[in-house]
């Protein structure tokens, strides 16, 4: 075994790429390290494509092994199971920039598996996973227009930081991942604290500039370790068939795309395509209908793009910078804690907000450590939203990714736990879809949070931008439709406030997207965002003054931290009885903070009263009503407060001489006592006769 190793400095860390030792039966295997975070990336491609396949079956599997962090998995089986949300998101992060680098017409199955085998808790594994994937594909011999670079960019004290550590990220106003080739940015994913557009654009340019060292290193690694290129050539177009398809369908498709209603347009496009295929079959029964379908799709794309480049109205009749008609409603569901219905053209989101206590927060145990997520946002895309049938069940990768994007857009304006001690779960149900449903979820979430009384800092709106570029001519489109996303060259989603950007996601399908184009897109997105915010603010301009009557109200009190064990009781008996008997939820913190949650105000008051009883100190000289709990020869023990007992000595029972305690007191008898003394050991001395004397004097 002769390993080939390439090392280089990248930001604060040393990156090492190694091949030739592990997983040698794969087409390519790279052990990639950034500091102590190490991933094994393998690539396998099938040499032959399945006959008739008209799509590229690329699979990216990213898996985090708990042994990488020196942990044993939880649960009964004690082994890793289905991918976590974090694993799904990182798999998508890797997939998105590499997919457009495979050539058109390449339909061989390719599988990339990234396994995290060692992790430094200060170095996230996503960037080195992207670098390792790029290196493995570069040396595999599989057709791939790489290499690809990747970088994380932070923004701390007005300065960009390359590949910040986890600790640095906690103090950063920006968490941006950018990936691209030597000449083009291909993918951006980010979360920001309402930063100006110029700062966001600068971070993309900075990250792309910095990753050139990665691209150069992988090119050198490929020169030394690369396998022979596959003997693959792109399929040659059947020019005669192309001309026939154009003649039969171009005019009909152009006419169909004059129809502005989505379902009607789709129906007419289907009619045109069916007629073209029927005519081709009549002329040549041996014609390959799959090839015809591909040519019709290409022609359809050319027709729509040509209209836009020529300055003609878009598919639905809008100008490039126009936003579709908006409808905004807040408080649409009677029993939810907050709700909103946001409609933009043929895209609609029904969004709900539910408030819970701290114990409702999501506990996440990953190889990077444990964390608690108080704000959750879940996105659902049922098949009826696009007029189709389909499977309904656990969320797919796309739904998880869109939900996380919307979460990033909102997270910057969420209140702290001190400002709002609730866990918050938002669910966005996409009830109609024709493009930009994730950004509709951002708008709907902002509205639902305000309706629920969550004190978010300000409203947030999102917009999806698109691009059509032919040569040097380009048109940036605001609020793209589903068709414009599919047929265009860029999907550019921006969420933010009036003051700045909170989330930016960009996927680019072509090279040649310049800084100028991105700048125009960001400025056009800002205008669209402000327009949407103006409409949203007319429906609900700020958060409600109070939370819903149906939501749990959290009341916070402070107790002596030394009294926490008294509230909990032996084996949790006291707090269990408190919650069951009052119907409240009670949470205790180490500093003595007690949070009582209930939608019933009287129940909360009763819980507070009982907690104050349990934690109150015994006062010398004070009169208490107590209960006899034990009788002994020398007196009786009386309970005066929860968990607080004292001794009434036989001499303190009565002014008369007492020979037998049982002649005067019995178990469970209620008596009035006066606290005479609390000694250094906390023992309480009580008197019945002194209490009677004091009461008599008061009368």
Curated annotation (Swiss-Prot):
A single cellular component GO annotation: cytosol
SMART domains cross-referenced by the UniProt entry: KH, S1
Domain S1 motif: 621-689
InterPro entries documented for this protein: ExoRNase_PH_dom1, ExoRNase_PH_dom2, ExoRNase_PH_dom2_sf, KH_dom, KH_dom_type_1, KH_dom_type_1_sf, NA-bd_OB-fold, PNPase
Root EC class: transferase
GO molecular function, one term: polyribonucleotide nucleotidyltransferase activity
Catalytic activity: RNA(n+1) + phosphate = RNA(n) + a ribonucleoside 5'-diphosphate
Keywords tagged on the record: Cytoplasm, Magnesium, Metal-binding, Nucleotidyltransferase, RNA-binding, Transferase
Cellular compartments annotated: Cytoplasm
EC number: 2.7.7.8
Cofactor: Mg(2+)
Main location: cytoplasm
Residues the entry annotates as binding Mg(2+): 485, 491
Pfam families: KH_1 (PF00013), PNPase (PF03726), RNase_PH (PF01138), RNase_PH_C (PF03725), S1 (PF00575)
Sequence ranges assigned to domain KH in this UniProt record: 552-611
Family membership noted in the UniProt record: Belongs to the polyribonucleotide nucleotidyltransferase family.
NCBIfam families reported for this sequence: polynuc_phos (TIGR03591), PRK11824.1 (NF008805)
Function as written in the Swiss-Prot or TrEMBL entry: Involved in mRNA degradation. Catalyzes the phosphorolysis of single-stranded polyribonucleotides processively in the 3'- to 5'-direction.
Subunit comment: Component of the RNA degradosome, which is a multiprotein complex involved in RNA processing and mRNA degradation.
Protein name (database record): Polyribonucleotide nucleotidyltransferase
Source species: Shewanella sp. (strain MR-7)
